[in-house]
């Protein structure tokens, strides 16, 4: 059976805490779970049936792969790199919030490669007819 001409993107299904910030975090696993799109990998478990499948492994509470790269704290505490969860809970211990260097490192290591992979797939695979951003 041929694969469907679809690219599936799952930006909010990850659960990992970036190791670079693990000692700064104060939210609980429950907070982290509530801030993401739980079970999206299971709901959209069609990896073997589509031409391309891209999923984030970092939890949305830390790097939101579905935001504009310039949507950042303090203007938006629930932006691309967060200072608060979507429910308004501080993510980092007081005095251990992200600085500009750490923010840029997280974007370079997690955000840009995710979007680069999507762009590469779309640019190099003319068979992909539809991209679905799944939540």
Predicted regions and their residues:
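N-terminal catalytic or cofactor-binding beta/alpha core of small enzyme domains
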Residues: 1-131
